[in-house]
Every structure is written in C-alpha cells, then in structure tokens.
Regions:
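Active-site-adjacent structural elements that line small-molecule/cofactor binding pockets in enzymes
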Residues: 1-168
C-alpha cells in the first residue's frame, strides 16, 4: 500500500507514537506531491510526522517504475528545498538543475511550517549531504563500524554547512 495513506490511518488510530516514512523516493514522487502528503500526515497526526527521503536505487527506480535514475544527490537536494519552501510558504516557484516548477500552491495551511526531514544514505557523499541539509540520516543493514564511519561523514557535512554535528 501507499506509505502516506497507511501512516494517515496510523495517525488516526494513535496519539503519541511518532510516525515516519523511513524512505520516500524522490524519483517516484514529485517534490510537491511529497510535501502535500507529508503535510497531510502531519495534520492528522497532530505534528507527530517525520519525513524520510532518499533517492532509492537504480535497480528499483528504472525497471520497477520506468524512470531514469540520474543525479540522485542533486535531486535529493532540490526536493528537500522545494518541500521545505512549500511547508514554510504554502507556494513555490522553483528553477533547479533537475526540478523546475512554474508555480505550485498548497491552497491550505500546513499544521507545521517545518517537518523534520531525514535522508537515507549509504555512501560518504550522501552521508555528508545528510549532515548539510537534514535533521538526520537513515542507515540500514550496516555494521557498528559502518555506523561509526557514517556518523563521521554526517558530522563532516554538518561542519561544512556551518551546523553543529550534535544537532544532526
């Protein structure tokens, strides 16, 4: 089923648990669609939603969805920027190197103007991006050693962006 629909049902059936997507692919959904879905779950959960985004993998995006998997890191960066602008401002015009939106308007006011965004990452560059622009990193299937090195890459990205690594 659809992760946002399932999370909305969970939101209506619970009161305290935090709800998150783990990873919603920035290739499979457009940035405005992600922002609308996130705002909807956040509304029905009364602010308990955490948005997890990532590029997914070429072996899923291309054969399973019929889309071209290219420039995943840039696509993630632009998607995060568009999602944040929509949540904050309610509308967006955006010209990026990948995402181009003439104008998109929510036509509603989100419950929160800022929803925490976590990014999925496996390799060093994407882990650094997590530190630069996200509230945290989503890593799976890793050893303790990989988790430690991943944390260092996230911290490097945070420092490069002028952020406190302890806040990521």
């Amino acid at each position: 089923g659809d992760q946002f629909a399932t999370l909305t049902a969970c939101a209506l059936a619970t009161r305290r648990i935090l709800l998150g997507t783990s990873i919603s692919s920035v290739f499979v959904r457009s940035a405005p669609t992600i922002a609308m879905a996130a705002a909807t779950v956040d509304h029905f959960s009364n602010g308990r939603f955490i948005l997890g985004l990532g590029p997914s993998h070429k072996v899923q995006v291309e054969p399973e969805h019929g889309l071209v998997f290219s420039q995943p890191i840039q696509r993630v960066r632009e998607c995060v920027e568009v999602v944040r602008r929509l949540l904050r401002d309610g509308d967006v015009s955006y010209k990026g190197s990948i995402i181009n939106i003439e104008r998109f308007d929510f036509w509603f006011t989100p419950l929160r103007k800022e929803i925490p965004i976590y990014l999925s990452a496996v390799f060093p560059k994407m882990l650094q991006v997590c530190g630069e622009i996200a509230q945290g990193a989503l890593i799976t299937w890793c050893t303790q050693e990989h988790a430690r090195s991943a944390a260092e890459y996230v911290a490097q990205g945070a420092r490069q962006a002028g952020r406190n690594p302890q806040e990521v």
